[in-house]
Amino acid sequence: MALRPQRTFRRRQVESSDSDSDSDGAKEQSAEEPASAGGRTEGAERPRGARSARGRGRVWASSRRSPGAAPRGDGGAECRTAELSTDEEEGTHTLTGSKGDRSPSSDSSCSLEERDVSPIVEIPDAAFIQAARRKRELARTPGDYISLDVNHSCSTSDCKRSNEEDPESDPDDHEKRILFTPKPQTLRQRMAEETSIRSEESSEESQEDENQDIWEQQQMRKAVRIPAGQNTDLSHSSKSQTLKKFDTSISFPPVNLEIIKKQLNNRLTLLQESHRSHQREYEKYEQDIKSSKTAIQNLESASDHAQNYRFYRGMKSYVENIIDCLNEKIVSIVELESSMYTLLLKRSEALLKRRQDELKCESSYLQQLSRKDETSANGSLAVDEKDQRILEEIEARRMQRRQARELSGSCDHQEGMSSDDELSPAEMTNFHKCQGDILQDCKKVFEDVHDDFCNVQNILLKFQQWREKFPDSYYEAFVGFCLPKLLSPLIRVQLLDWNPLKMDSIGLDKMPWFTAITEFMESSMDDIGKEDGSDKKILAAVINKTVVPRLTDFVETIWDPLSTSQTRSLTVHCRVAFEQFASENEVSKNKQDLLKSIVARMKKSIEDDIFIPLYPKSSEEGKMSPHSKFQERQFWGALKLFRNILLWNGLLPDDTLQDLGLGKLLNRYLIISLTNAVPGPDVVKKCSQIAACLPERWFENSAMRTSIPQLENFIKFLLQSAQKLSSSEFRNEVSEIILILVKVKALTQAESLREERPLEPLPAQSTGV
């Protein structure tokens, strides 16, 4: 816009006023009248600066007057200029109604000056001036205010021109506010400013042409006198141009999507950050609420804490008391165990010594009997009184056992198969008396102790209550690993009168402590959520720590492998004990020690107790001879040990049993005795008894065509016996030999023997031949 700056106008105004005052006084005189009129108008609006306002009005009037214009035309131009500036100022800071009210008065005053050249104009009253001034101040105060009334707004160029043409609208010097920093702009102002700058840059040439045309029109309006009608049209055209320019300045440019997208993204980021902060605050508040509720519950359950404390304190006191009690009683328990063990050991040693002495005495007697030169003249032997007494006792006990078998109906029993473990009445009385005294002392151990501290079931109930009420602390205390050691003294007391070598002894699974521990474990298995496996191992641990060591002591010093009753009872109790280790992957040292003791004891029995003498054929004539009877008793005694060894099938490894039973006993003693005997039905019967003792599990494999290596000597003896027996007299015995071969899986030998000797069809057992 080609408008001249305000300072340039002022400078030219001052110069023109000075030149006019020096050169032409008449022109100044004619110009002062309209100027004074304009000055009075401004003076009414601003009473405190009336004189300066009138001076400025004269300067404006003189500077805009054309030199060649007539006085009347100059006056009209000056009036229109003053009125135009007044209209622009009022249009910017006042309402439309005020401007409409003042415009007719201004037009009428101007027309009167043109027609009558009268200096009289309408002066607004003080209230109107004060209200207009107040509105201007309020309009200037909010920097981001944009009026929505287009009639009251103006374009940027019009506002600038209004300010340039009407410097009197500026506040006085003492009312001006000095700005040291740029006034902050609002977002709408910045957008409008950027929009106007881009529009000015894009249409710079057209804007300059338009501004030039406007400036020329203004200059022509100043220089040429325009009639009233034309002035009105010009005023309307100026207003329409102003409105048009206003519309152009406030209209928004085409939308830039990148800027909008960026602003939306920024706004979205701010909202998301705000949402996250609110979410964090919300979570914090929720956590505070939870902690508050927990605190409330803790405070409300303060009584439960008191009860828990009393329970733990009572449990601690209970455990301390039971430990003190057991520490005090363990000395008496050990003494009683030692007394009972000593009593049983003395009895076992006495029986073993008696058997060995009787064996030596009888063997010596038979040796003397075989020597003809040692006999006396009347044919009797010179026997020591002691040996004679031993022989009489041996024969008396045999008579008693024979009578007992006849009463029981066991007529097929062989001499030597029974256990010679009978005691004399005096010895039995003394033994039972000592055993009763020990058991009586055992009852007095916990006589002064409450059942809650000496009864296994009551103790486990206490710990079961702990496990049910506070399982976490129960399992954290590893109670399941401590209970076996805690219960061990009490179980040892119950095992004090338990003899695993007696058939009538109570089984382990029938004992009260066994039942109580089993129930405790079953209740633990019901609590699946908290079960850690320690309670399931309590019974196995108790047996491993308490029962197995006691079994080991019995095996090492008291057990007699030649006793079938003791061996059967011992194997039954060992199977019950070993069943508890079936699910355990770890190897128990106590169990291995027990198995080693069993093997060692059987080896010792084979070496010390087995003796089968070989007499000359002449000494064995007749089955009723002393030599023949003694040899038969010793053979059947060895066969009984062979059978007792094989009773450990399933408890001891197969290779160990085969080495003991077959290698050390069958091949070394039994086969030699059979080879020295005369072939016949008795030999076949003994072979059948040997085959009956062999475990069937060793021959379950249907693909086997040959027997186990340790039975090779036995199979050869069977074939030799079958060859010596004639088919006509011993047909049944040969068939029995074939059945024995089939049982021990010597199928090839059985088939060859059957082909050599055509016999009757074999029973169902030999269908595999």
UniProtKB/Swiss-Prot annotation:
Carrying Phosphothreonine, the residues are 86
Chief subcellular site? nucleus
Q: Where is the composition biased (Acidic residues)?
A: 202-212
Query: Where does the protein end up?
Result: Nucleus, Nucleoplasm; Nucleus, Nucleolus
Sorted alphabetically, which PANTHER family does this protein's record hold? Answer: GC-RICH SEQUENCE DNA-BINDING FACTOR (PTHR12214), INTRON LARGE COMPLEX COMPONENT GCFC2 (PTHR12214:SF4)
Which GO biological process entries does UniProt record here? spliceosomal complex assembly
Q: What is this protein called?
A: Intron Large complex component GCFC2
Q: What does this protein do?
A: Involved in pre-mRNA splicing through regulating spliceosome C complex formation. May play a role during late-stage splicing events and turnover of excised introns.
Provide the GO MF annotations for this entry. Answer: DNA binding
Residues spanning the signal sequence:
none
Comp. bias intervals (Basic and acidic residues): 190-201
The UniProt keywords, alphabetically, are: Coiled coil, mRNA processing, mRNA splicing, Nucleus, Phosphoprotein
Write out the coiled-coil annotation as residue ranges: 256-308
Q: Which family does it belong to?
A: Belongs to the GCF family.
Q: Name one GO cellular component term.
A: nucleus
Question: Where is the region Disordered?
Answer: 1-122, 134-212
